[in-house]
Amino acid sequence: MRAAAISTPKLDKMPGMFFSANPKELKGTTHSLLDDKMQKRRPKTFGMDMKAYLRSMIPHLESGMKSSKSKDVLSAAEVMQWSQSLEKLLANQTGQNVFGSFLKSEFSEENIEFWLACEDYKKTESDLLPCKAEEIYKAFVHSDAAKQINIDFRTRESTAKKIKAPTPTCFDEAQKVIYTLMEKDSYPRFLKSDIYLNLLNDLQANSLK
């Protein structure tokens, strides 16, 4: 059986997103100690990291607005559509990135990471399903998972049974729980956040130039 790796390539532009290095897997005491120190410092430096990310992101989007020939230009109208539903937000690659940044600021980025991992899993070739299912389960669903998602006991146990004979839909139940959690909890706050409103205001202002 070929080894399978979970891939969410577009999100790797965001700091610390999907499947960042696990200190326990690093070789050598020096690396482990260094990584432990970085983890302890994260709460102090995260705000600065987020601001730096947004500062680098906004000019890029603004410069894209000026090129009418580009088919991938992000418009203010498109960003406004994100407020219509979580479904529309997640259907847009930049929307995924911006929402992921917001979730990271709330230390709940595991929700979108799991949701995206499930979307990727559904497209997996059948012979790779067992490997990938185990990786997703260990990363997000297992009770000792480093990025454990907030699902009820029954859903967790049901998912554990399903991955023993994995199918493309074995994570659907857990994915639905997490989607509903984001939709009712994080998504409304995102629409009122500086991350979203500043991006929208910048694009609207730029469109008037």
Swiss-Prot record:
Keywords per UniProt = Cell membrane, Cytoplasm, GTPase activation, Membrane, Signal transduction inhibitor
Which CDD domains does this UniProt record tie to the protein? RGS_RGS1
What is its induction behaviour? In response to several B-cell activation signals.
For this UniProt entry, the molecular function terms from Gene Ontology, in alphabetical order, are: calmodulin binding; G-protein alpha-subunit binding; GTPase activator activity; GTPase activity
* Subcellular localization(s) per the UniProt record: Cell membrane; Cytoplasm, Cytosol
Native source species: Homo sapiens
Gene Ontology CC annotation, any one: cytosol
Assembly and partners are described as: Interacts with GNAI1 and GNAQ.
Sorted alphabetically, which SUPFAM superfamilies does this protein's record hold?
A: Regulator of G-protein signaling, RGS (SSF48097)
- Briefly state the protein's biological role: Regulates G protein-coupled receptor signaling cascades, including signaling downstream of the N-formylpeptide chemoattractant receptors and leukotriene receptors. Inhibits B cell chemotaxis toward CXCL12. Inhibits signal transduction by increasing the GTPase activity of G protein alpha subunits thereby driving them into their inactive GDP-bound form.
Q: Which domain of life is it from?
A: Eukaryota
Its topology with respect to the membrane? Answer: Peripheral membrane protein
Spell out the SMART domains in the cross-references: RGS
User: Which residue ranges does the record assign to the RGS domain?
Assistant: 85-200
- Principal cellular location given in the protein's record: membrane
Q: What is the name of this protein? A: Regulator of G-protein signaling 1
One GO BP on record is: response to bacterium
